Amino acid sequence: MNNKLIIVTIITVLVAMVSVSLYFLGKTKTANNKTYKVGILSGSDIFIPIVDGFVKGMDKLGYVQGGNIFYDVQKVNADHSAFKQIVEKFVDDKVDLIFALPTEPAIVAKAVAKDANIPIVFVGDIEGTDIVESVSHPGENITGVRISGPQSAAKRLELVHEILPQAKRIYLPYDKNYPITSATLELVRSVAKALNLNLVELPAESQEDIIADLERRDRLPDIGIDDIVITPNPLVTMPLSWQAITTFAQKHDLLISGTLVNQINNGAAFVLTSDFESMGEAAASIADKILFGIPAGSLPLETPTLHLRVNYSQAKNAGIELSESFLLKVDEIVR
């Protein structure tokens, strides 16, 4: 009887200790009276859902906006000089952490904030850049969430071939100056060669370049392309570029393989990408570790899962019959 009483007492004490520990663990962010300042730089409006996911994730972790954490959110559309000015202001303001996205702003943030020893969390691609040392050990004062843009572009090319094996001329517009373009092209060209596909490349420097090329093709007896694969770079997904691409595709019954979630309801027959809000929440989890003292460069990059989404009506309008084997791979069908 005494043994049973002792065991019950021990269990009760242990449960109480765990409960108290969990309570204070949850209260730590406010109990230590520390206030954090986080500078957020988004290089394009299309990535705002990632920022929203980041803030939401920080809320879940116990950070209270206007209480123990303050955000300076700066949104710029593909303006490299503005990226630098914004990060310089973050440095002058002595923020505790910088959250930068996508690739270009992250590269600028790393360079500008290096001497200030401000940790950086980013969401972006790493291929073809020196932004990190490796996936497992980013190094220096940076870590984050990897988008895997080149890999998704290559996989989408394979999916296009699976859906429409007769389509041999694949239109590939891209920003020739974007940091990951070379790495993307190397991978996509390799896949195209293996599948015996002809990439009709358009190296562009502006939205006007894309618009002009599509207008030129529209006047030809043969437009010279069978389908369109969108590469991971902001230029092609900016409003004027995207409007021109979707209008052209609709007129000529072309399939568009997109690279952003919102494109599934805006002209793309299918997209293969990670969920933006989830990426933001993953970045928040990393930021939390850094704010509690773990060196940024020691935290491995996170690589989120790619999800295949299909707009069934869009595919049908383009005259495409989706096979059962293809549909089995789909994570979400929009009708």
Task: Enumerate the predicted regions with their spans.
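Short hydrophobic alpha-helices and adjacent helix-cap/hinge residues
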Residues: 1-335
